[in-house]
Regions:
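Composition-driven recognition of glycine/serine/threonine/acidic- and proline-rich low-complexity segments
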Residues: 1-142
Length: 142
C-alpha cells in the first residue's frame, strides 16, 4: 500500500519502527518481522502495519535494506525490481484498542474524535511466485 499512500498524500511516507524481531534460520526460513508506522514529513500517522518476511526469498542486499528500516517494505521491494503479487487479501474493520489508539492518537491513547473504527487489510505477497510476506496494514482514522 506504499504507492497508494504516496499518491493519496502527495509525498513519500516516512517510516518509524515500533518493534522488530528476527527468527533464526531454520526449517521455516530466516523470518524478519516488524511493526511500523507510515507518517507524513510533519509526523502525522497515516498507517500502522505489521509485516513478516521470509528473507530467504530475496537477495542479501535487499534483505539488508529491509533490516535497515529506512524505507517502507513496499518501496524496498519495488526499488529492487522484485516481481510481487499481492494475494489472499481480506479487508478488515478495526476498532483500535489502547496500543493502536496510542499509535494513532499520541500519548493519550485516544483515537481522533469521531473516528472509533477504521479499516485495513490482511494479505500475503508472493515474490517470484513464492509466498514470502504476510502483512496487516491499518489506515489511521482521519
Amino acid at each position: 500500500m506504499t504507492v497508494v499512500m504516496e499518491q493519496f498524500h502527495g509525498e513519500p511516507p516516512h517510516l518509524q519502527v515500533v518493534a522488530r524481531g528476527l527468527t533464526e534460520a531454520g526449517a521455516r526460513g530466516d523470518w524478519y518481522a516488524r511493526e511500523i508506522l507510515l507518517l507524513s514529513a510533519a509526523g502525522k500517522v497515516w498507517q500502522q502495519g505489521i509485516v513478516r518476511i521470509d528473507l530467504d526469498q530475496i537477495d542479501p542486499a535487499t534483505a539488508a535494506l529491509i533490516r535497515q528500516a529506512r524505507l517502507p517494505l513496499g518501496r524496498v521491494l519495488i526499488n529492487a525490481g522484485l516481481l510481487r503479487e499481492v494475494q489472499h487479501v481480506a479487508l478488515v474493520k478495526v476498532v483500535p484498542g489502547r496500543h493502536l489508539a496510542t499509535l494513532f492518537g499520541g500519548e493519550s491513547g485516544r483515537v481522533p474524535a469521531g473516528s472509533r473504527a477504521t479499516y485495513g487489510r490482511v494479505a500475503e505477497i508472493s515474490l517470484g511466485g513464492v509466498p514470502a510476506v504476510e502483512l496487516l496494514e491499518i489506515v489511521a482514522p482521519q
